[in-house]
Swiss-Prot record:
Gene encoding the protein: fabV1
The protein's assembly and partners: Monomer.
UniProt: NAD(+) binding residues: 48-53, 74-75, 111-112, 139-140, 244, 273-275
InterPro entries per the UniProt record, alphabetical: Eno_Rdtase_FAD-bd_dom, Enoyl-CoA_Rdtase_cat_dom, FabV-like_NADH_b, Trans-2-enoyl-CoA_reductase
Entry EC no(s): 1.3.1.9
Lineage, highest ranks first: Bacteria, Pseudomonadati, Pseudomonadota, Gammaproteobacteria, Vibrionales
Biological process terms in GO annotation: fatty acid biosynthetic process
Protein name, UniProt field: Enoyl-[acyl-carrier-protein] reductase [NADH] 1
Length: 400
């Protein structure tokens, strides 16, 4: 079939398998061009491995460090009539390309929050790798099914205490609007912590540790975003921020546990990037369009792949073997360039000046839209979008 982008809300409901593969190839090419990561781990588990930072982590480990990788994710396959999710095609492309280079790559597809996912992953590690040296936790899900009760818990992207009103961009109509978001209830705050906090990361690491599949010196990292006062009301000071603070709590508990065998647990605070997750957060698209333009001008712009390669090579697995620099909460900070005073001051001053008329001129809004479509495999150089493609891509993912 010939597949074109169809946008609904902040989701593109179609995906292009060839475009998704081209995306993965681009990230692999970048990683190889940077050269090998000297002290990289050799057996890596990535929970949430099919898109965004999780996918880039798997690529950095495999193509930057020569690691055997296991990926866990929840994606839908395509059929002859309907494309699957972008993450499905990303993961399929990754496996194919890794194996072509003689790298071990296996994936489990299903609910990563479930007990079954953890057990099947443990079984696979025991069977094929023995143990793992690194666990990346990169789940971004709006819903979590509690394994014990089957209850569905939903997160809320809302402020706390009062209604938040701000300038935002309507990405469907490309116009500047005033967006208001009602505050979260106590229950919604608790639920957001349950879905997006550190509990499931702890459950994963504890299950892996109890099964004896974590090697001595195993490092684990989970991803977070803090941002600046421009986004704090909806993010760090909102329900989502409470969940991210819970991630810090979990990191501290896990670090105590893993340090006994020479390992570590850290939250890595990353920069804002265009992902399906960030596009759903009110105000983020406009902020990203502003900050990207300034960071590009300053020569410090990074996408997912650049950030993660820097995290591996300059933080966790440095060439001289020295310990990673961390902040006062033991976090790895890769948002350091985004948070530079000159960059943030530029955004603060620009924010009130943005109108529908000057949006494309004063920000990287056009590039934001292009990057968004790229997530789904569209608008990529060298891909023939008039060609007939089969959305039914064969894989040997292990069903959870």
């Amino acid at each position: 079939m010939i597949i074109k982008p169809k946008i609904r809300g902040f989701i593109c409901t179609t995906t292009h398998p060839v475009g998704c593969e081209a995306n993965v190839k681009e990230q692999i090419a970048y990683t190889k061009a940077q050269g090998p990561i000297k002290n990289a781990p050799k057996r890596v588990l990535v929970v949430g491995a099919s898109s965004g930072y999780g996918l880039s982590s798997r690529i950095a480990a495999a193509f930057g460090g020569g690691a055997a990788t296991i990926g866990v994710f929840f994606e839908k396959e395509g059929s002859e009539k309907k494309p699957g999710t972008a993450g499905f095609y990303n993961a399929a492309a990754f496996e194919k390309l890794a194996r072509e280079e003689g790298l071990y790559a296996k994936s489990l597809n299903g609910d990563a929050f479930s007990n079954e996912a953890k057990q099947k992953t443990i079984d696979l590690i025991k069977e094929d790798l023995g143990q793992v040296d690194m666990v990346v936790y990169s789940l971004a899900s709006p819903v979590r099914k509690l394994p014990e009760t089957g209850e569905l818990i939903r997160s809320a992207l809302k402020p706390i205490g009062q209604t938040y009103t701000s300038t935002a961009v309507d990405t469907n109509k490309d116009i500047i609007i005033e967006a208001s978001v009602e505050p979260a209830t106590e229950q919604e705050i608790q639920d957001t912590v349950t879905v997006m906090g550190g509990e499931d990361w702890e459950l994963w690491i504890n299950a892996l540790a109890e099964a004896g599949v974590l090697a001595d010196g195993c490092k684990t990292v989970a991803y977070s975003y803090i941002g600046t006062e421009l986004t704090w009301p909806i993010y760090w000071d909102g329900a989502l921020g409470k969940a991210k603070m819970d991630l810090d709590r979990a990191a501290s508990a896990l670090n105590d546990k893993l340090s006994a065998t020479g390992g570590s647990a850290n939250v890595a605070v990353l920069k804002s990037v265009v992902t399906q997750a960030s596009s759903a957060i009110p105000v983020m698209p406009l902020y990203i369009a502003m900050v990207f333009k300034k960071m590009r001008e300053e020569g410090v712009h990074e996408g997912c792949m650049e950030q993660i390669y820097r995290m591996f090579s300059q933080r966790l697995y440095k060439e001289d073997g020295s310990a990673a620099e961390v902040d006062e909460k033991n976090r790895l900070r890769l948002d350091d360039w985004e948070l530079r005073d000159d960059i943030q001051e530029h955004c603060r001053n620009l924010w009130p000046q943005i109108t529908t008329e000057n949006l494309k001129e004063l920000t990287d809004y056009v590039e934001y839209k292009e990057e968004f479509l790229k997530l789904f495999g569209f608008g990529i150089d060298g891909v023939d979008y008039e060609a007939d493609v089969n959305p039914d891509v064969a894989t040997d993912f292990i069903a959870i």
